[in-house]
């Protein structure tokens, strides 16, 4: 009987959550991410994507592309995590087992769809999306096919806010023209090998013989990719254990001999790991840098922050402070950066622009034995905010509360005045009020209150307090 695997992907999830809870932002080009000089876009609304802005892009570059109308919002991960839990509560109730890939996407294989027609699958997916939209207010896209690969490609075709079903007899119409890099597992190295063979599309790979694939790519990985290219994907949908660490490392054909080469390698690995961290939706408390020297010695050093963060500038700065160079340890062959101590809830940093200054790790003692890790912690290393910053108290996009006007968010602050827009998910576009910076009635608020899901939080034991 026909097997149907579905892939659901929330549309521009972080930005959609901001537009949901702050009606003023609906229809505007929203960029979610760090505001520091090395800030990175964690999420971009479709209005911002029209200008070429995208996730993982340096914030200054995204702002330049969008122009004067760009709205930059500090991430509120506690809101995104709560929204994700509510979305997948709905998905699991309808579909049963769900294989979560990240905070905003997952696979499912509903028993009710075994042997179903493409039309029935489309109707089921539309009903799921409609319930998610009705309950949470958030848009989603669903792809469906005979396996995970095609389902995930299908959800990309469905975006934004749609369903794309790929019948078995039509799957090669979708797969064959796509670049071979669209296949799961085809990275730069494999892609380079395939290119040298004249393989540019998935159809080109599917047309190879089994012997050609085994000789060029190996009997295990090669055949797996070949099967995916031919539309054969029997991987089961099953729950995944939550990742405890996110990392990326690269081995170099030629030894790294200069500081500049090592710096470039750290940036390459840090950026790759950070892209995966953003997709995961959690923040990291611990940063580690791994080096393997030309003589195969391995050195790994780590540093633990006092809070979890996904701010790229902070994480990169920490990695650089952990780095060692050829003048100290000799020629280097491998460089890796990893993030661990992953947490859904992270400390709300009042002064995000000071993040990089907080990281002042002492020089750790290094053990050169293979696999031994030395570490240090930031628990005893604190940098106080300057008095003029500390007195300011308010930062743009911060959640606040006023006893007369209710929940709102800071639109701007300066010269002794703070402007607040009062609105939540369940209101219309809110009005703006200005207050003295030290007005006692204006207080910091729980970001979760902007969702107006008090009943659901009570039923599910959810709170906005960090544990």
UniProtKB/Swiss-Prot annotation:
Annotated UmuC domain residues: 5-187
CDD domains linked to this entry: PolY_Pol_IV_kappa
Cross-referenced InterPro entries: DNA/RNA_pol_sf, DNA_pol_Y-fam_lit_finger_sf, DNA_pol_Y-fam_little_finger, DNA_polymerase-Y, DNApol_IV, IMS_HHH_1, Rev_trsase/Diguanyl_cyclase, UmuC
UniProt: Mg(2+) binding residues: 9, 104
Free-text cofactor note: Binds 2 magnesium ions per subunit.
Keyword set includes Phosphoprotein: no
TM region positions: none
UniProt entry keywords in alphabetical sequence: Cytoplasm, DNA damage, DNA repair, DNA replication, DNA-binding, DNA-directed DNA polymerase, Magnesium, Metal-binding, Mutator protein, Nucleotidyltransferase, Transferase
Region annotation Disordered: where it falls in the sequence: 364-386, 428-449
Cofactor: Mg(2+)
S-S bonds: none
Entry's localization field: Cytoplasm
Residues annotated as catalytic: 105
Primary location class: cytoplasm
Catalytic activity: DNA(n) + a 2'-deoxyribonucleoside 5'-triphosphate = DNA(n+1) + diphosphate
Protein family according to the UniProt entry: Belongs to the DNA polymerase type-Y family.
Function text: Poorly processive, error-prone DNA polymerase involved in untargeted mutagenesis. Copies undamaged DNA at stalled replication forks, which arise in vivo from mismatched or misaligned primer ends. These misaligned primers can be extended by PolIV. Exhibits no 3'-5' exonuclease (proofreading) activity. May be involved in translesional synthesis, in conjunction with the beta clamp from PolIII.
Protein name: DNA polymerase IV
Annotated organism of origin: Corynebacterium glutamicum (strain R)
């Amino acid at each position: 009987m026909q097997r149907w695997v579905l892939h659901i992907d929330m549309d521009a999830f972080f930005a959609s959550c901001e537009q949901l809870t702050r009606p003023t932002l609906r229809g505007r080009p929203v960029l979610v991410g760090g505001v520091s000089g090395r800030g990175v876009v964690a999420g971009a609304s479709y209005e911002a994507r029209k200008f070429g802005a995208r996730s993982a892009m340096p914030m200054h570059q995204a702002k330049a592309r969008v122009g004067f109308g760009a709205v930059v919002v500090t991430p509120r991960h506690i809101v995104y995590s709560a929204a994700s839990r509510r979305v997948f509560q709905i998905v699991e109730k309808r579909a049963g087992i769900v294989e979560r890939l990240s905070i905003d996407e997952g696979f499912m294989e509903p028993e009710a769809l075994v042997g179903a027609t493409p039309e029935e699958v489309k109707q089921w997916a539309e009903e799921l999306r409609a319930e998610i939209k009705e309950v949470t207010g958030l848009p989603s896209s669903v792809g469906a096919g005979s396996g995970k690969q095609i389902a995930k490609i299908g959800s990309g075709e469905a975006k934004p806010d749609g369903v794309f079903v790929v019948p078995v007899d039509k799957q090669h119409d979708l797969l064959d023209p796509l670049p071979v890099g669209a296949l799961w597992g085809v990275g730069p190295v494999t892609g380079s090998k395939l290119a040298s063979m004249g393989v540019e599309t998935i159809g080109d790979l599917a047309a190879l013989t089994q012997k050609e694939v085994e000789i060029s790519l190996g009997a295990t990985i090669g055949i797996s990719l070949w099967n995916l290219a031919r539309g054969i994907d029997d991987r089961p949908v099953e729950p995944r254990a939550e990742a405890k660490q996110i990392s990326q490392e690269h081995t170099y054909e030629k030894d790294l001999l200069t500081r500049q080469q090592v710096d470039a390698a750290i940036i390459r690995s840090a950026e790759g790991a950070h892209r995966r961290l953003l997709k995961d939706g959690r923040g990291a408390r611990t940063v580690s840098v791994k080096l393997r020297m030309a003589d195969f010695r391995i050195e790994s050093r780590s540093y633990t922050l006092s809070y979890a963060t996904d701010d790229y500038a902070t994480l990169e700065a920490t990695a650089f402070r952990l780095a060692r160079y050829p003048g100290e340890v000799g020629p280097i062959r491998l460089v890796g950066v990893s993030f661990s101590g992953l947490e859904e809830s992270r400390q709300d940093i009042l002064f995000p622009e000071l993040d990089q200054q907080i990281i002042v790790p002492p020089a750790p003692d290094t053990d050169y034995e293979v696999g031994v890790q030395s570490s240090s912690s930031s628990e005893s290393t604190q940098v106080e905010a300057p008095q003029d910053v500390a007195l300011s108290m308010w930062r743009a996009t911060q959640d606040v509360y006023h006893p007369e006007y209710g929940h709102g968010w800071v639109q701007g602050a300066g010269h002794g005045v703070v402007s607040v827009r009062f609105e939540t998910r369940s209101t219309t576009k809110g009005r703006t009020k200005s207050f003295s910076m030290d007005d006692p009635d204006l207080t910091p608020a729980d970001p979760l209150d902007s969702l107006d899901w008090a009943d659901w939080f009570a039923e599910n034991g959810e709170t906005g307090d960090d544990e």
